[in-house]
Every structure is written in C-alpha cells, then in structure tokens.
C-alpha cells in the first residue's frame, strides 16, 4: 500500500519537479496532529489533495491511511497547489500554511423504513441527541429511536432494526386528524407533533423494558393556530415549544399543563362544526386542551419554520414565505428584528459558532444570514446546488461548519461552509455530497431526473451523531445514511 | 549586208584558221619536219579517198609547184589579190559564192558606209558597216600557209591557178572548185565526218574527226561536252543528321562568335550619331494628310462641349490615406518586422492579415522589384467593377441597436417562475381549470373526471376531492377572492357548485358556511316565481341545496344554469360572480349571468345579443371600478354596471378570443386600464385602453392557440403569463408605469415547457400565486404543475 502511494507521489513529483513550495502542515485535531518538531516541508507544487493526503499519512506513520482534506486560508484545496497559487497570486517562495482535516467519507445507505404514506417529519432519539442531553437520560447504543410523522396522521417510533416500536392512536382515539408535518422528541418519554389539523399535540411515550414495544398516549392538545402547522421547535429545559403555521403566526407553547392557558373556544372543534361533527362523535378519550402562551404574528405570509436560539432559549427566529427572517424576544413575545430577503424562506437552522442562520429558500438555494443587528449584509453566503425548494435543514453534529439540507428535488446535500468558490455573485458554497433517494435507485432510475422531484421529495432531514443522516420524504420511507465521521470536525 | 557577212565569215574563218594554225603552229614551231609529214598525211588521206583528179590537185598544191608559179605570176597578183584572200580566209561555202560577192563589193566602194533598210515597221533603218580594225589589227601569229596577198580582192587571182602566196613566197594553189569535183563527189560515198566545208586555211574539205563528231553530238543533246563527266556520281552527304565521330572541323569556335563586333558597334554608333544629329530620321514623320474633301461634311459632336456638374450618382473613388513609413521602400528600422512578426504574417491567411504588405528594406529604389500582385490586383479590381460597381447608399448613421427599446435582461427582472417545483398528479383525464386560493396555500383544480380537488400547493399533497359532475367535466374552478370566508365555485355540466372544502379551521369554516347559508333565507323571502313564468326560458334559476352525498363533501349550494358555463369570474369583494355560457345553443339573453352570493340570486343583465363578434366567451369584473368586461369572439366590451351603459369597445383584431385579463393595479396606479387578450389564433395582445381600441402590442410567440392569459394578481410583480396548446407557458414582464408618458414595457422572460400535448391540447389554464412569483398550470396530460 505504501509502495503504491510512494510511486504515485513520485510520479506526481516528477511531473512538476521544477517548482517547489514550502508548506507548513498543521491540524487542530490532537489525534492526527504532526509532532511539534515537524518543520516546513518542501513539496512540489504539482501536488493535489490525494498526494498531500498520502504525504501526511506517511508522516504520521499510519498503518491504515486516513483520507485528509486540506485547507489553505480557510478554503478547501480543490486544485493542485500550483493552480491555487496562480489563482490567488501567491508567490511560491512564501511558506504556505496548510491545515488538514479528516476528509468526508461518502455517507452510505444503511436502511430504509417504509411507511404507508408520505413521511413529513423525522426525529432521532439517541445518546447524543438534544432530547437525551436535556433529560440527562442515557440511551445505550443500539437503543436509538427514530420518530416519524406521516401524512396519514400517525406518529411512529422505530428502533434501529426497522421495527415499529410504537404508533400513535387514530383520530378517534385522540390522534391527529390530518397529516403530520412536524414531530419531535422533547425527552425520551415525550413527543410533540403538529400538522395540517392545526393542533400541536404532546404525547407521552412509554416503552416496555425489552424495548420492542411501546405506547404513545396523548398528553395535551394545543389549540391556537388557524391553519396548518409547518414546523416545530422544542426547548426542553424551559419546557417551551415553537410552532410555525400557515396562518402567518408563530405559536409559543408550554409543555406543561399547568403553565398553559386555556384553549381558545372558537378554535376547539365543537359539535356545531360541520367537519368535526363526525370526529367528535367517535372520540372516546378526553384530552386536556390548552392554548398558546403567545401567538407571534407579524409575518404576512405562512410561517415556514421557527427555532430557538441554540444558546439562548428566550430568543426565537422564524422564517416565512413573506421573504423575511424575524428575530423574536420570546419573553415579551416582541419582534426584535426583521431581515428581508428576496425569496420565500422555507426552512431554518442555527449555526451558533458562526452567528449565522441558514435558511432554505424556494429559489433552490440556502442563504446564510447573520441575524445580529450589527451585521451590515443580510446574506453572508449562498449555498447553491439544489434544484428545488429547500425545506429542511440540520446541523452536522460533528462539525460546526457542516450542514445538511433536504429539498423537494429529492436529494439531501451536505454542505461545508468552507467549501466555496467565487462566483460572479460573490462567494458561493458548493455541496460536498449529495444523497439521493434509495427508492429511485431501487427502481433503477437513479439517474433519471424527476421533474419537480415528483415522488421523491424530501420533507425532513435529521443528522444525529450516532444514527447518521435520517431523511424522510414523499417516497414513503425514512432513509438512513451514515458516514464514519462524514465531515471532519475542526 | 553581204559585206558584213563576208567580214563575219572572214572572222570566223580566221578564227578557225587561228585555231588550226595554233594547233599546227605549235607543232610547227617544234618540229618543222612533222608539219610536212602532217600535210603529207592529209594528202595521203585525200589521195586515198579521192581519185586521180585529187592527185592532180595535190600536184598543184605541192610546195615545189607553188613556188614556181609564184615567181611567175607575182606581178599580176596585187591588182586582184584582195578578194581571193577574203575568200580564202572565209569559209569554203563563201568561196562558192565568190563571183557575186565580188560584184557587190565593187559597187559598195562608191557608197557611204551605211545602208538604209526597211525594218519590220517599214521605217528607215541605218545599218552601218562593221568597223574593221585595219592596220591596228595585229596578226602576230601569221601562219605558214596563210595567204599573204593582203587586202586585195581574190578575184585578181581568178586567172591564175593559185590564189596567193604564203609567208615563204610559195604559191598557194587554188583548191579544186566544186564544178570539177561535183562529179567526183556524186560518184563517191560521203565519208563519215564529211561536212561539205572547205577548210579556209588549207583549202581542203573540212572533215570532222570521230571525237569532234562525238563532241557535236553531245552539244546537240544538251549534254555536258566535257569528257569523263559522270552526271550520276554517288551522292556524298557532307551535312546530315548523322553525328560524326570526327567532326568536319575541329577548329575552335572563332572569337567573333562571342565577342561583340566592334565593326557593328561602330556602324551602329554611326547611325545613332546620325539620328542624334538629325541626319537620319528614325521613322518617317507622319505626313499630315490634310485632304480637305469639300464634298464630305464633318460634324463635330463635341464642338460646344461645356463642363458639366457631376452626375448625382457619381461616386468619387474613396480617398486613400497617404502612405506611411511602413510602406516606404526603405523604412526606418523600427518599422521593420522582426522574424516572429514576419513568420506570423506569412503564416496568416491572406484575409486575416492586418496589412497586405510586409515592410521591407530594399536599400535603394532601383532594387525594388516589380510588384508581384499587380496583375492579380488589376484583375480583381476589374471583377469588382464588374460585379460590384461603386454605389452610393443613402446610409443612416444610426446604430440599429439604439433604435430598439432598451429591454432589461431577464436576469434583472427576477424573480419569475423558471422551473417546475411540484407536479400535481391525480386527475384522470384533462385538468380543465385551476386556481390558487387567496392565502396561497391551496390549489383547486377541476378536470374531465368530474372532480374538484384541493391540493397543498408546495408539496403537491391532495387534501380534498369531490366528484361534482357525474358525466360532465368540471369546466372551471375559482376561489372566492376575499379571505374572510373560503368558497370555491366550480362549474360542471349545467350547474355551478359552491363548495366550502373541509380543510379549514372551525372558525373560518363556520364563517364560510354562514355566508353561504345566509342567502337561503333571502331567497325564500322573495316571492317564488309564478307557475306561468316557470316554463319560460328567461326565468333566472333558483339556487338549490345539493344532494346529501355532495353536502357531506362540502358542497353548499348548486345553481342550475341549464347551459354549460365555461367561465366564472368573481368580483373582488366576493359577493358577486359572473358566469358565461358560450355555447352556441345558449340564448343570447341567458349567456351571461351575474350571481349574488348573499342573496342566492341569479340575474341575466343582458337581454339581447351582443352585436357583432359572435357569442360571448368570458367576462371579468374590473378590479376596482363597477365595470364588467365581456368578451365575445372578436371584441371586448366594457359596461358600466351602475349606469348600465356600454363604455368601451375594444377590438383586439383577433378572430376568436379565448380569454382576457385586466391588469390588477390598472386605473389605480395609472389612469388607464391595461388588458391582455389571448386568442385561439395564437396571438397575445396587450391593450392600453387609454391609447387606443387597438392593441398596443401583439405578441405572437406561440405555435398554437392560446387558452388562458393572466396577470399576476398582486401589484408586486409586473408579470403576466399565457398558456397555449403547444404545451408551453410563457412568462412576460409587463410593467405599467405610473406616469402617463411612458408606455408599458413588455419583456418576454421565460418559456415553461413540461406539459405533454395530449389530444392536440397542451396547457388548459394557468393561475398565479397571490403573493409569490409562482405560477401554476393545468395540463391536458392530467397533471398540474407549480412553477417557481
């Protein structure tokens, strides 16, 4: 193996032996850092990533080569060093500081969980998920749970062996009357879900000791929205939920029965209501009904997503079809700031380390927005690559630079905000990997391009450190992909 | 004459004698004895041939006898000596005529030395005697046997047997005369070589030898008389094509062959000098032939030729710029190309070369060679003149680009729909109509399968479906525009269905139901139509409650129109809507109906047929004014509903209008209304009602009929779109400015393709999202598409 690498590096060096550049290889990760004594190395400028990776592996003396990626001045090296120097006008006589990180390994398809209907939402309960950490609970490896909310109105909890551990009750027994578009674990024992039936429902989730059966029992029905709910965000330590609805408002809810105000009468389905008549008749259980702590309504179009600030649960962000991203003070339920873009915003994720908010737009890209009032430019960066609306975003648990997006074009794309290229629009990010739907491959149409992502739209994506990338979509299945340290942390 | 003859004869004789004398004299000079022997031989011959008489003669002519007689007759001879001498010196023939000659010559002496004779013309001719050389004649070689009697007539010796004396004083005996001999001659055979002549020098008959006869024969035969001449000698080819090994001449080439001749040069210089000095004229100066023929009249055509201004079409040759340093034969070194430039120039195509020549340093003008391209250039110039004569074009110095209106590029006019985001699949058969609800969350569609469906717009999830038409297709679906209540109007078959889809929150649903239910009471309070009026066709229909199955599915009211409605258009406040039944069987008065939601009331505002343009096709309320626009096949008419007046007739010029739409902010932003009209004859027409009844702009971009046109409903995006049977939608940017001065600018933005053409039909209907620059289209292929 090493012999092969040596020969390749020798070949590479012979190609451009005439020019050499002094490089200082550094790494921020302790386990792969070179010894202190390693000084600048003179390397041929014709080297590319692979040759450099071989070089670092040789220097580290790794038996099993680890693929590395190389960063010069915060941008990935995608060309030869020579081309990079030429493109950036750097003299070959300067000492080049190259940072190396573990390369991203293409995420592999692990499993697909098939549903009866479109899957609108997905969440993961694992040792590293937020819900577990908030509850200080312990989830042993192999006991991870995946929660899916489907368009048939049912919540399902899956174990990793693609078995359904628990299913939510039918509408007659206090379940959702319409499609579920958002579902999340609050804690290992509680679930929140919402959908087109305009209610946010809190569920109690109990599991038998063996972990092969469980029960989802309705806890609270939260009324307040007048139209379908598009997304949910939870903050378990403060027992708060944010919901984004098509009625242009954001619901701010409490998970505690005692905290919540009474449900507004006009929105509770009553016997007089024509459509709820049938449902009411057959309803056998009575569930506590509560109202919102606050309805934040200043958006002028359906709100697509609302999240808590990762660091400060009193701050919320919301995106809407009205092209705006709004910052809320949740304590006073007051609008703090509005950032307007030029497209409908359909999804939202917070990147706290960079003070950025990533939002997916209907214009098929992801915009990174700095929400701070001091920020002069609204859009820090644009990540381009999707061919349809970007409706779901999730952070990379391994890296603060990583991001995954789910889009209606039927792909999930992994982004590293350091992987950029300069376009005529400014700095534009490129996706690192694109995950297609397994269902297409099974049909043998992996290459076929679906117009409008028909049949394979991704509605939800979740990235967990231990489970991997979980995505759900129109193909009625949850797809799990995993890469060993898909994105290098740094 | 006879004298001349005599003299001639004498001469001839003399000659003969001389020849013979020569022959003999030579011999004589050498050997005198041989002479005697010869004469003896002659005598012997004659004696052999002749008889005794000859002998006698011989005897007479013997030397001894002659000597004796000479001595005896010496005194008498001088008187008569000349004539015999003459005769003696003459030929023997002359001798025969001697007597007559003597007579004449004696008479001649008294006459002058010429004679007058008549020539052929009868004129006198003087013939002079030949001048004798006389004393001056030199007889240097006097022969031995020559008669020495001198110039005396020979007749003096007629009495004597001799005729004179030779140089030795011996008598020359008279030869035997003919009379004496004739008898002998006749008696003997004429021997070979007999001439009949007498040798005057010997007096013997002249006989020719064999050689002489041969010679005479050759002369007679025109042969070369020389002996031994062979006229048929073999030909020796000296100069032939054969290459001789040894040349005829091995002499070296003479110098004159290659050295210019000094002599010739001298001669030429002489001539040149003469020419220079004018002594020789090199050519003849043309003689000015001024033959003024008075009979010919010459007319001078150009006699009164005056300078005329140039013809208007006269095009002077373009002025070339003066030559620069580069074109010099000796350019400064900085203008000379280096090797690289030279190579580049040579390798370049002649057409691509920046200049046609390569600056070259020749050093001096005389080293400049002839221009190689001369003939070619002249030829091409001729071709140019022949094929492309210089013409003056009246060229406007206007950049054509500047004449075009400055259209912004589509990139600047973003956002506009460009890609298909969602496909709505579910309808069986064509989707005939669709509409996005006022909140922009739902999409309602109606199709050939008789169902009305409601979809979630973004995801394409079907939320609700109701089958309203059992057999008939749903022709049109339209949402009620305001947001306080949600009502969907659908036309299927002869009926209009008002639907409240069960996807609403209870509060809104209740409001919607209340709105629709309120009318029942109003209709009931109205007096029911009389039985007699019931049968009349013009009676407005009564609204009815739907069947239980439909009512469970959200249908709240049904309007039985009795004719197929193809167009529904809501008033912006949501209380009225207008339906149009364009079928040809529909009575004109019932084609257009206005329905009032709150009163469950249907009215027919038009009692008579619209004049001209066929049956009505579609109708729309003005977005802000109480004006109803009704389109029939060829015109669009605007009616003021409050005053019940025809306000305006718009003539788009289309053969068959399919649809039209009114700009949503027109007449609020600007003073005038803007209309777009789509027609089945593939035209999309923009009308500015302030400008004209005629279209402001006609857009023909579709290959097939245009089915639907629609402005973006919000004033935010100045977009409009049309849907065509060629399976495509076209998106245009059409901004209406506030001021009256500038007209609307229309920019084609995007052609959206995706719908399959099914049964000659492509896109049946389109609608815009109320806020976003998204658009939805209904296809004949059974799908609807969201474009964003």
From Swiss-Prot, chain A:
SMART domains in the record: WD40
Query: Region (Ubiquitin-like (UBL) domain): which ranges?
Result: 21-102
Q: Where is this region: Disordered?
A: 257-285
WD repeats at which positions?
129-168, 175-213, 224-263, 298-338, 340-379, 385-425, 453-490
* Record carries keyword Repeat: yes
Say if the entry is tagged with keyword Nucleus: yes
- One of the record's GO cellular component terms: preribosome, large subunit precursor
Sorted alphabetically, which PROSITE patterns does this protein's record hold?
WD_REPEATS_1, WD_REPEATS_2, WD_REPEATS_REGION
User: Which key words are in the record?
Assistant: Nucleus, Repeat, Ribosome biogenesis, rRNA processing, WD repeat
Top-level lineage group: Eukaryota
Spell out the subcellular localization from the entry. Nucleus, Nucleolus; Nucleus, Nucleoplasm
Checking InterPro entries in the record gives:
G-protein_beta_WD-40_rep, NLE, WD40/YVTN_repeat-like_dom_sf, WD40_repeat_CS, WD40_repeat_dom_sf, WD40_rpt, WDR12/Ytm1
Q: Which GO terms describe its molecular function?
A: ribonucleoprotein complex binding
Any Gene Ontology biological process: protein-RNA complex remodeling
Q: Which family does it belong to?
A: Belongs to the WD repeat WDR12/YTM1 family.
Q: What does it do?
A: Component of the NOP7 complex, which is required for maturation of the 25S and 5.8S ribosomal RNAs and formation of the 60S ribosome.
| Quaternary structure note | Component of the NOP7 complex, composed of erb1, nop7 and ytm1. The complex is held together by erb1, which interacts with nop7 via its N-terminal domain and with ytm1 via a high-affinity interaction between the seven-bladed beta-propeller domains of the 2 proteins. The NOP7 complex associates with the 66S pre-ribosome. Interacts (via UBL domain) with mdn1 (via VWFA/MIDAS domain).
Q: What is this protein called?
A: Ribosome biogenesis protein ytm1
Q: What is the organism of origin for this protein?
A: Aspergillus niger (strain ATCC MYA-4892 / CBS 513.88 / FGSC A1513)
Q: Which gene encodes it?
A: ytm1
From Swiss-Prot, chain B:
WD repeat start-end pairs:
426-465, 469-509, 611-649, 652-697, 701-742, 758-788
Q: Which SUPFAM superfamilies match?
A: WD40 repeat-like (SSF50978)
Pro residues: bias regions: 318-335
Ranges annotated as biased composition (Basic and acidic residues): 115-125, 337-354
Give the chief site where it resides: nucleus
GO terms under biological process: maturation of 5.8S rRNA from tricistronic rRNA transcript (SSU-rRNA, 5.8S rRNA, LSU-rRNA); maturation of LSU-rRNA from tricistronic rRNA transcript (SSU-rRNA, 5.8S rRNA, LSU-rRNA)
Q: Where is this region: Disordered?
A: 1-125, 308-354
Checking InterPro entries in the record gives:
BOP1/Erb1, BOP1_N_dom, WD40/YVTN_repeat-like_dom_sf, WD40_repeat_CS, WD40_repeat_dom_sf, WD40_rpt
UniProt-annotated location(s):
Nucleus, Nucleolus; Nucleus, Nucleoplasm
Q: Which GO terms describe its molecular function?
A: large ribosomal subunit rRNA binding; ribonucleoprotein complex binding
Q: Which segments show compositional bias classed as Basic residues?
A: 1-12
Q: Name one Pfam family in it.
A: BOP1NT
UniProt cross-references to PROSITE patterns, sorted A to Z: WD_REPEATS_1, WD_REPEATS_2, WD_REPEATS_REGION
Keyword line: Nucleus, Repeat, Ribosome biogenesis, rRNA processing, WD repeat
Cite the record's Acidic residues compositional bias ranges: 41-79, 100-111
Q: Which Gene3D superfamilies match?
A: YVTN repeat-like/Quinoprotein amine dehydrogenase
GO cellular component, alphabetical, reads: nucleoplasm; PeBoW complex; preribosome, large subunit precursor
Q: What family does the database annotate?
A: Belongs to the WD repeat BOP1/ERB1 family.
Q: What does this protein do?
A: Component of the NOP7 complex, which is required for maturation of the 25S and 5.8S ribosomal RNAs and formation of the 60S ribosome.
What interactions and quaternary structure are annotated? Component of the NOP7 complex, composed of erb1, nop7 and ytm1. The complex is held together by erb1, which interacts with nop7 via its N-terminal domain and with ytm1 via a high-affinity interaction between the seven-bladed beta-propeller domains of the 2 proteins. The NOP7 complex associates with the 66S pre-ribosome.
Protein name per its UniProtKB record: Ribosome biogenesis protein erb1
